[in-house]
Amino acid sequence: MTTLTQSTTWKALQTHSSQLPHMRELFAQNPQRFEQMSVAACGLFLDYSKNRVNDETLKLLFSLAKEAKLSEKITAMFNGDVINNTEQRSVLHTALRSKATQTIIAEGANIVPEVQQTLAKMAKFVGSVQSGEWKGYTGKAITDIVSIGIGGSFLGPKIVSQALRPYWQEGLNCHFVANVDATSICEKLKNLNAETTLFVMSSKSFSTQETLTNTLSAKDWFLGQGASQQDVAKHFVAVTSNVTKATEFGMDANNIFPMWDWVGGRYSLWSAIGLPIALLVGMDNFTALLDGAHQMDQHFADTPIEQNMPVIMAMLSVLYGNFHGAQSHVILTYDHYLRGLPAYFQQLDMESNGKSVTLDGTDVDYSTGPVIWGGEGTNGQHAYHQLLHQGTALIPADFIMPLQSHNPLGEHHDQLASNCFGQTQALMQGRTYDEALAELSNSKLDEQQKPLIAKHKVMVGNKPSNTLLMDKLTPTTLGALIALYEHRTFVQGAIWQINSFDQWGVELGKQLGNDVLERIGADHDATDLDGSSNALVNLYRKGKL
């Protein structure tokens, strides 16, 4: 057994968690529950009162965090200590949104000047594209950007760009390509004009299979539209560490933006990987995005854990995963622009904390990362919310909503907000059998049917949720929101004693994919894989069933 599960606090939480009354009773016992269980920081407001906790629960959770030396681990990350022990790397995505006056050491050097130089280089490039100064090979300004990446190099820029749609530069559009499925890039290129299209290729090595394949196909398309090899530099730029390969491809060394080993892919949107975001919304808004994240960094680093928003959210997740048997967590965004956030947080959390050994290689004997999923309100209310209300699985929920809409049309936002708050109330409160039966008292149902229907209308409630609010969705509040979930993910990993910053499962998938590709391209049937894989490869080689 691990030391975590043998701790006195862990065992106390196991006992305590099974003894709490229903949340209805917790609210009845404490009229000040909302005021005592809410916190504001960095333009965000968190109501966590609709959780299965009382003062004693929170005390135990914070004790668990202290036993895990959470504060020391937070300091170690911000200081650039090598906390990614399997790859021997610092974890300094926070440095990407630091201020120019700060000093942050990685590998023996202050990395802040290099970060600031990259931002300045981005600003110059973004300004030239947005102003129309940057011309394509026929002298026309850029109208379309195609961002080519995979994983964090794709999902972060895409979701943030989608969320900041009200801030896009007029006349500029962006198209995101990640999947190696040819349909993805073919559909994107179908209606584009090569003369006015700019490609941004993001790959640290300039050799990531999906990204390189898509970039080569984009180049073939570009040349096929009448352009020449010497025109490539006007239409292709890269975010990469491999300047040699990028220049061999035809890119100008002046239009190659750096990546660093101390930034993981799923934390990289704050770096030059965010170039597509900056091209769309402008450098001022990109800087505001960084500033929102920096504000959350400061809150996370400096605030006592009892009032620390990322810590509170993380410890609640630990509570449900380790002491209530929850296997998933749902993110529900009540804002159309934020509809992509569940997928982004899914990658952030599951790639980080989908681990089964501790930092020292011990097999864990407790649950780690949950399945993260979700969608857009109110759509989900007519689908999977049914399972949240009456299913047998406990699924904690995060509701995220701005108080003000970018599109204030009639009563739309009032209805959206009422649905959001109503769902949190319904999950917490539920409906008893007596309440259901009373609601049916004036119905036209046969008296013998009413007890049966009432039974089907019962909802046990006591389903936990957080509500996250902001005045309005802006670059600053979005930056703070994303950083909040980054730090929440870190805290969970710190409690579970796992490495949240490697991804060996992803690496194995890449390795085996390349092995299979060799068999597909061979001049004979596959025989040296497992029986199923051999058969699938050979069936694919035939091209038909």
Curated annotation (Swiss-Prot):
It catalyses: alpha-D-glucose 6-phosphate = beta-D-fructose 6-phosphate. InterPro entries: G6P_Isomerase, G6P_Isomerase_C, Phosphoglucose_isomerase_CS, SIS_dom_sf, SIS_PGI_1, SIS_PGI_2. The keyword Transferase does not apply. Its EC number is 5.3.1.9. Keywords: Cytoplasm, Gluconeogenesis, Glycolysis, Isomerase. It is found in: Cytoplasm. Pfam families: PGI. Pathway: Carbohydrate biosynthesis; gluconeogenesis; Carbohydrate degradation; glycolysis; D-glyceraldehyde 3-phosphate and glycerone phosphate from D-glucose: step 2/4. GO terms for molecular function: carbohydrate derivative binding; glucose-6-phosphate isomerase activity; monosaccharide binding. Catalyzes the reversible isomerization of glucose-6-phosphate to fructose-6-phosphate. This is Glucose-6-phosphate isomerase.
